[in-house]
């Protein structure tokens, strides 16, 4: 039995259900469920409330039976307000995506956060300042410009022909690709300036994951219509020199806990497109690949070197192809399961599939358990 395993067993013995944790973010399930396996009493403060969320106390924004649209219904301030009331009751706080990533985010002074705190997350979520710092430090980034109006955007497109548009604040999320020969006024008029424009670099998207200053793994990202839709972990066909480069980024930004760097490859070198200073979407695939409880490692970073992802896992977030009624059964490989008969809008997430093989057949089986809302409505009317 190695030292890491001994540490796990000793923690399980001493914790004994006495420690309390709070997990905060849009989707807290992976971290919550890891902490429950360690014996924690867990509070979940989130937007989503899947059926397989095992928290002791759940606070959520979504209507489990009528999901609506995330962009219209999400309210970061409500989550932070709830978390603030619980913060003093818990021993530790874990932060996932979707909070402290906006210009007007309220920044609490919590001193029990595991990893990067709200202030650090907010600082790095200012993409424009982060890109400027990366460039000043000598790291490769795509050519980037802050765009204040349609005229500036057109000039940028004249130079690069194709570009990627991103909001100034935020980490991860969706992006918009536009081209000079398809400069659509209808689309442009919907853009909220100022915005960031970047040169378009053709190629696959990757991420590098760290815990503290310890490199954990590379991942190949699955991007569908400009939106993160999953990943493959680990991805091993990348040079070790990339690890050194990204290690310098982690050190330069003084990042703690779990952090990720998204990048593309140009001229055989990495070009950084995002820094994510909080618990990542790859959390679960790393856990499965390494056969270790990642929450334990986040609680004690010195054991990060024991995390060795080996088995290849694929994660896919499934989105509704039309407005649907979901009736997804609980089974292996399926996560983030909605409440039975939940109505989910077109384009919104249905569930998450994580598997080593047969991923397509599993995905198809999930879609087969979803009925078209309009067809179901029509069937009811004909009864």
From Swiss-Prot:
Gene3D superfamilies, A to Z: 2.30.36.100, ATP-grasp fold, B domain
Residues spanning the membrane: 6-26
One family name in Pfam for this protein: ATP-grasp_3
PANTHER family: COENZYME GAMMA-F420-2:ALPHA-L-GLUTAMATE LIGASE, RIBOSOMAL PROTEIN S6 MODIFICATION PROTEIN
GO MF annotations in UniProt: ATP binding; coenzyme F420-2 alpha-glutamyl ligase activity; metal ion binding
Annotated membrane topology: Single-pass membrane protein
Coiled-coil portions: none
Domain ATP-grasp: from-to ranges: 131-303
Subcellular location: Membrane
UniProt protein name: Uncharacterized protein MJ0776
Keyword Membrane part of the UniProt annotation: yes
């Amino acid at each position: 039995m190695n030292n890491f395993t001994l540490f796990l067993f000793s923690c399980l013995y001493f914790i004994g259900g006495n420690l309390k944790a709070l997990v905060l973010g849009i989707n807290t399930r992976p971290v919550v469920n890891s902490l429950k396996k360690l014996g924690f009493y867990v509070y979940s403060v989130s937007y989503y409330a899947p059926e397989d969320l095992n928290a002791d106390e759940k606070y959520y924004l979504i209507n489990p039976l009528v999901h609506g649209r995330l962009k219209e219904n999400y309210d970061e301030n409500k989550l932070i307000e709830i978390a603030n009331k619980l913060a003093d009751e818990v021993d530790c706080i874990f932060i996932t995506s979707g909070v402290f990533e906006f210009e007007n985010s309220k920044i609490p002074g919590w001193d029990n956060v595991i990893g990067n705190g709200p202030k650090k997350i907010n600082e790095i979520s200012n993409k424009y300042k982060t890109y400027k710092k990366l460039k000043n430090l000598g790291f490769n980034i795509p050519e980037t410009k802050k765009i204040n109006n349609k005229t500036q955007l057109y000039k940028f497109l004249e130079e690069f022909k194709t570009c990627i548009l991103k909001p100034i604040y935020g980490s991860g999320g969706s992006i918009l690709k536009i081209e000079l020969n398809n400069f659509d006024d209808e689309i442009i008029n919907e853009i909220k300036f100022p915005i960031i424009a970047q040169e378009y670099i053709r190629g696959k998207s990757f991420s590098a994951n760290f815990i503290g200053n310890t490199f954990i793994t590379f991942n190949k990202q699955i991007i569908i219509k400009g939106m993160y839709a999953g990943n493959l972990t680990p991805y091993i066909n990348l040079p070790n020199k990339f690890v050194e480069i990204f290690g310098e980024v982690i050190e330069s930004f003084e990042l703690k806990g779990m952090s990720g760097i998204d990048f593309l490859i140009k001229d055989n070198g990495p070009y950084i497109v995002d820094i994510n200073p909080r618990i990542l979407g790859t959390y679960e695939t790393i856990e499965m690949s390494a056969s270790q409880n990642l929450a334990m490692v986040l609680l004690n970073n010195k054991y990060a070197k024991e995390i060795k992802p080996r088995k290849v896992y694929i994660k896919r977030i499934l989105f509704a192809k039309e407005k649907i009624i979901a009736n997804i059964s609980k089974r292996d490989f399926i996560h983030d399961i909605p409440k039975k008969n939940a109505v989910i809008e077109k384009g919104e997430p249905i569930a998450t599939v994580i598997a080593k093989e047969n991923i397509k057949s599993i995905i198809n089986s999930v879609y087969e358990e979803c009925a078209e809302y309009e067809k179901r409505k029509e069937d009811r009317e004909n009864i």
